[in-house]
Amino acid sequence: MSEFSTVSCGGYPTVSDTFGAALWSIDYAMQMSVVGYSAAYLHTRERNVSYNLFDYLGDGVDGWITRPIYYSYFPILQGLQSYNGSRVVDLGLNDNSTAGYGIYDRETSELYRMILINFKDGNGPVDFVIPATGSPRAGGGKNATVKFLTATSIHEGSDISWSGKTWKGVLDGMPVVSGRDADLTQMDISASYTLKIPSPGLAVVMFEKPLPSGEPSGGGNSTNSPAGSNGSGNTTTTNNGSALSAGAPMIVALGAVFVGALVLN
């Protein structure tokens, strides 16, 4: 695709320069991957345009600020990079505030990444239930690493964290420790696992060792994750008729969707 962004001809203040725009950009890019686009240009323009990736301050201040949409590049890169090529499947979550994508190895058809998006604004985390069974997973399906993209609000313009790092208050382009939502490493997913994604926020779930280019400079902090738990709630349906659960706090179960998604490959 030649170009895309939030609002044509430069964006719109309070829309294009928010964390919500970053999540939207990721969701849109993944939708393009689902239907077969191989590349796209996330548009940016001259200084002080609302949907820019970053801006030179000028006016006597020597430095650059990083805008929210720049953060969208990292989950997309981390999710789609592969050795053999990728096949992306929309998991069909039947909810306006969540989205999920399974990313499969084009040669082996193993599920090796997921991107899970929570668009809710500050109402507590959403629980995404990762089942013990379903499509074959890369790395044997026993462990996973999770990287988070989060912000304090869907309207936030600077206090954003990716993989435990942020560009908030940074003028030299080098990220610093954000102090929140660090990576989860070596998650035991041999049993059903409940992944809590902050509101708003996004998680990239990796079932095998990530390639190095998805890291901000300096890498992210890591912690060991607690054991997962089963979720329960009221039953709704996905777009392909598979069951998922939703409750309060909201729970999204992904098990049956994986089986259906693998057939599409």
Give, region by region, the residue ranges found by the protein language model.
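Aromatic/acidic polysaccharide-binding cleft in carbohydrate-active enzymes
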Residues: 6-101, 108-110
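Carbohydrate-binding surface patches
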Residues: 93-139, 146-153, 200-203
